[in-house]
């Protein structure tokens, strides 16, 4: 009961598993906040700590055109599906353009009669209506045929979205985006292992601290598991060294156990015989 919260999480990923996947950003928001507003603060946070990624995989709520363009200014490529669906079988991305994105021809090769600039800076391209009327793909085409003209309008944003939708159909996009599913496993670990849904604190500040500590704990578990896997792989690749490694590990563990006992005994003796000076010694 009470005010609801949601946690935004960013983590690293490596396709070759040469490094553990670790959480690099945690932020707690009110439950009604939109995910679209969480991307840029997250990028600014990791950039300030020199942890900026080169690519960021996110779902469509984070991958709006404005977020993608602003992330590019931070040197980050956002890989995300676009919102909405393509309305025609032929899209803006199927037309041919110059390097400055001036429309040169339709997919079947018809060139525009003229191009005008609209009120908001977009382009209004006019084609020959008679030619469009004879086109075998007119039902699939976004060009609008009205009275004496056949026109199509677009701006930079519409063209970017069309190109992104076209890119989403490629094998390269599917291969890159499949790693995004890893964050779902992370959220599951935070819930099952760390109990992030059942915090014993209230208030935004306390919840943020608790969520950050939970994420830190998960990072420690992952780092330890990664180190154990790495050690086991090494033992499998070097069977002659496995016995030596086991002995060295046992000696190391025993040494640190004895050192811990010695420190505890020294502390007890110090507190017993030198208690008035203990605080001063700690400060020094």
Where on the chain are the PLM-derived regions?
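Anion-binding and metal-coordination hotspots
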Residues: 1-284
């Amino acid at each position: 009961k009470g005010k609801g919260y949601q946690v935004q999480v960013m983590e690293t990923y490596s396709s070759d598993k040469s490094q553990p996947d670790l959480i690099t950003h945690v932020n707690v928001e009110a439950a009604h906040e939109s995910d679209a507003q969480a991307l840029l603060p997250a990028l600014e946070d990791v950039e300030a700590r020199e942890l900026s990624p080169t690519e960021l995989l996110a779902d469509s709520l984070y991958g709006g055109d404005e977020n993608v363009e602003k992330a590019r200014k931070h040197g980050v490529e956002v890989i995300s599906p676009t919102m909405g669906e393509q309305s025609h079988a032929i899209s803006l991305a199927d037309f041919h353009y110059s390097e400055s994105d001036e429309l040169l021809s339709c997919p079947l090769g018809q060139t525009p009669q003229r191009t005008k600039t609209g009120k908001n800076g977009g382009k209004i391209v006019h084609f020959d209506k008679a030619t469009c009327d004879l086109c075998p793909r007119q039902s699939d085409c976004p060009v609008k045929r009205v009275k004496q003209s056949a026109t199509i309008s677009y701006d930079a944003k519409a063209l970017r979205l069309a190109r992104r939708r076209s890119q989403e159909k490629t094998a390269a996009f599917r291969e890159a985006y499949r790693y995004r599913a890893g964050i779902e496993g992370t959220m599951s670990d935070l819930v099952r292992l760390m109990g992030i849904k059942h915090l014993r604190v209230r208030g935004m500040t306390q919840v943020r601290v608790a969520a950050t500590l939970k994420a830190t704990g998960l990072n420690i578990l992952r780092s330890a598991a990664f180190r154990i896997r790495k050690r086991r792989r090494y033992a499998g690749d070097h069977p002659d060294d496995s016995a030596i490694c086991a002995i060295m590990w046992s000696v190391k563990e025993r040494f640190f156990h004895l050192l811990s006992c010695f420190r505890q005994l020294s502390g007890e003796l110090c507190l017993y015989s030198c208690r008035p000076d203990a605080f001063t010694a700690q400060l020094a």
